[in-house]
């Protein structure tokens, strides 16, 4: 597996290809399109199997001390192979280079029983993220948001 920073003009098309292949996580068209638009302006690291992208992560600066893991997505057939963890390590290093001391991530709260997001939360916890707060209405009552944080 090869990991590389993604040039500006390649970010949105790469994001679209991965997210459209993950409808269990990114099946709400409006949300998916918002992510695709947002990544164009964010730092992105991708994982490649040969020339084919199989996952990516994006970083959004928040405050001088905090950055957000804006998005991380790996094709489902490549789950549980350490790709997400490697993408996260590279995003963490980039956040530290930018002066961040903490990394945050938002995900679906446990009050929504979606099994895919239960696995996502377990991944974040294994990577050292801790739950901070639930925002029950940020994404709508059916999609409560959990904010998690990790010290870098």
What are these regions (language model features)?
Residues 72-80, 109-111:
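A short, internal acetyl-CoA/4′-phosphopantetheine-binding micro-motif in the GNAT/acyltransferase core
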Residues 117-120, 134-144:
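Short glycine/proline-centered loop/turn elements that form peptide/ligand docking sites
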Residues 124, 129:
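Conserved active-site tyrosine of GNAT-family acetyltransferases
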Residues 121-123, 151:
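Short, hinge-like loop/turn segments at secondary-structure boundaries
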Residues 42, 143-147:
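Short hydrophobic/aromatic beta-strand or adjacent loop that forms the aromatic wall/cage
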Residues 3-71, 75-76, 88-90, 94, ...:
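Acetyl-CoA-dependent GNAT
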Residues 95-116:
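Conserved GNAT acetyl-CoA-binding A-motif
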């Amino acid at each position: 597996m090869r990991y590389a920073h993604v040039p500006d003009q390649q970010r949105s098309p790469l994001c679209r290809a991965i997210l459209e292949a993950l409808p269990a996580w990114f099946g709400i068209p409006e949300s998916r399109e918002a992510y695709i638009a947002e990544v164009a302006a964010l730092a992105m690291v991708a994982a490649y199997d040969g020339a084919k992208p199989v996952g990516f992560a994006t970083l959004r600066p928040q405050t001088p001390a905090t950055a957000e893991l804006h998005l991380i997505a790996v094709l489902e057939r490549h789950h549980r192979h350490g790709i997400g963890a490697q993408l996260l390590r590279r995003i963490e290093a980039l956040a530290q280079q930018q002066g961040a001391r903490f990394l945050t991530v938002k995900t679906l709260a446990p009050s929504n029983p979606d099994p895919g997001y239960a696995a996502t939360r377990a991944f974040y916890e294994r990577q050292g993220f801790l739950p901070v707060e639930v925002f029950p209405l940020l994404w709508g009552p059916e999609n409560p948001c959990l904010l998690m944080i990790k010290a870098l």
